Amino acid sequence: MKGRSASTAWRIPVILTLATGVGLGVFTMVAHGQNTASGQRFEEPAPPAPRDPASNLATKIGAPLTVVTVGDVMVKRTGANLEAPEFQNIFKLLKDADVTFGNMEGNLSDLEHFNGPLRGMMGDKDVAPSLKAMGFDLMNRANNHIFDSDKESMFSTIAQLDEAGIAHAGTGKNLEDARAPAFYDGPKGRVGLVGMHTPNGANTNANATYRSGNLGGRPGINALNYDVIYNVTAEQLAAIKAIRRAAYTPPAGTTNVTRLPDPAAEPADKVQFLGVWYKVGTPGTRSFEMDAADLRENLRSIRNGKYLSEFMIATCHCHQGPITAQQWLFEDQIPDFLPVLAKKAIDSGADMFVVHGPHVVRGVEIYKGKPIFYGMGEFYYQWQHMDSALLSGSWPQNGRADDSTIDVRVSAGLRPINFESMVAQTKFDKGKLVEIRLYPTSGAWDGPISQLGLPRQAPPDMAQKILARVQALSKPLGTTIAIENNVGVIRVGAQSAPSTGGLQ
């Protein structure tokens, strides 16, 4: 059962300075190992052997530990007090966990006192306390909706989560603040969190920047930037290179021309033309190259966070997919950089890696005994739950709100699959992963608008469909998922027991 405790205070070492002449003299004699009474010199003790870094990067909670993770939380109304079993069965998973994590996708504020422009997703002041009461301990904030209502919405959400006692990572007043790990001090130990976002090109204005001297930096997200590379055949790449040469061949007599790179100095299988990269690969797909500095500094933050905690979660909000033409709402395939990022994060000390952002579920992988969730889907999905002021601000081209703007199923082009998700319950014992249970959830695509997007236990036929999908997506990753009583079960350790009835 989840307990709550105040954050542990830091213990700051006290440094005593020897300020007097006598003190300095004594210090000098001791430092040189000289006994003034006998003239005997003392051997200085050998320095202690450096600690094995692996001990600091290991899972340090030996007691049984249950971590529950969910995907995106876009919430206007939590429904936490709804007594129907299909709701409470899901909420109980969150409450009973030792640690509960989700991605706080929308924004929160006290709307009566909010001074920013109202646009996009905004929940009222009672949402954060309700999420806390439901069991949320840690939330990611690095995502593409933090500036829906400009920077004011980011700061108001920070204030709301702080007041509710929910630790959060991924945004801040500058990049140092946004990239720093957050911590939750629970009964089983301290849990750290580093939150990242791989922004789309249009969203880089939300990227936080470093402070420099008296310049405070720009507020925003902890971004992991990247280059997109479109894959083409070798013949197509040669044609692109020829087109580039032709485009940059000036008429005779032209001065001050732009010089192309020396073809001999370029990679044979890759070229950039008009700001777009191309390389030889499978046509119709794209690859991603992470920014080296962003990757290095995020891994450093994960490593530092693990040094200061007993358990570490690394998380990334990612909308990218490998298939160029696939609509972003339905990208169930994993882009090539995500496994690299997840495994480097685990090698840097993360005990689990959680991806959110895809509006559908993806597969699960186990790497070195640590879980990687490549797509958790939508937990709360309440775009449509907006006050009239927010509606008019979100869709100014529509004038007055009507049925097509209020019903997100019409206005956003969503499908039932976007409302079929899961809750992951991960169990550790003696610092080792033992078992993962996947509980399917439904956002009630066929239900009334007032309850659309509220998470509830999926009915049996839908549960089987969701689990079969995750099972198929996980198989190429080397993960076997058993489906028992409408629950997906991944058994890792010998202590894992058969499922005895799901959410009862």
Go through each PLM region and give its residues.
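Acidic, metal/ion-coordinating pockets
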Residues: 23-26, 30, 34-504
